Amino acid sequence: YINFEGFSNAISTVGEYISDDALVIIETTVPPGTTEKIAYPILFEKLQKRFPNIKEVLLAHSYERVMPGPDYYNSIKNFWRVFAGCNRESSLRCKDFLKTIINTEKYKMMELKKPSASETAKIMENSFRALNIAFIDEWSNFAKLIGINLFEVIDAIRVRPTHKNIMEPGLGVGG
């Protein structure tokens, strides 16, 4: 069960104050379908009360791929972005907005067909990273248990061209 109360309240508040031509971009990790099935209806309802002739809401999903630490801002500007709008105008406006922030000459943007695809991509990215961290963490525990140097083992594996990106042990998932 996912409690969307806080998220829904925030979207509702946004909907009470934005103009009918404002673009809303959800940049956080949310379950697939959240942008279209939760945020969109709330925004549409709030905007329709103030703008009865409104036909569609300008809403998109574009998640951040930031690296914490001293280079945080650089990781926003100089990194690839995925985005998707709830409708064509939302996608176009989102792309135009992101172009003002992202270094698109070096870091291309990827437009997906639906926000749920963008939301899924973010969760898959997070899951992929978490699984790899957990994987190497388990091997680290095993190496300690049997008394071997896991860094030496990893170096031996990395000679294979397809395995150069194997992670090294660290603090573990969430650490």
Model regions: which residues?
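Structural/interface elements that position substrates and couple domains in central-metabolism enzymes
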Residues: Y1-G175
